């Protein structure tokens, strides 16, 4: 099972925990990415500290890159094995797969 950094409460860096998270098959219009790189952005500190609060528990991070592992129905122009990157919400990019 893939792992991700998750927070269950706002606070200092110590509230971030490395946990296993279920990742299902992509739904229509979605892809599954085996992430190899994540971007660190100051908004992640805002989410973690509570300046921009999230519902808990929640993943953090807004950008990542990796290889496409699976493609949902209706996706065009992206195939399994393609290298991709994104910088968009919802938060949760601090993860091995998404």
Regions found by a protein language model. Give the residues of each.
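Short polar catalytic/cofactor-binding loops
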Residues: 8-12, 38
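Short structural boundary motif marking the start of a folded domain
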Residues: 1-5
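Conserved catalytic-core motifs of eukaryotic protein kinase domains, centered on the activation segment
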Residues: 45-47
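A short glycine-rich beta-alpha junction/loop motif
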Residues: 95-98
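Short beta-strand or tight-loop elements
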Residues: 14-19, 64
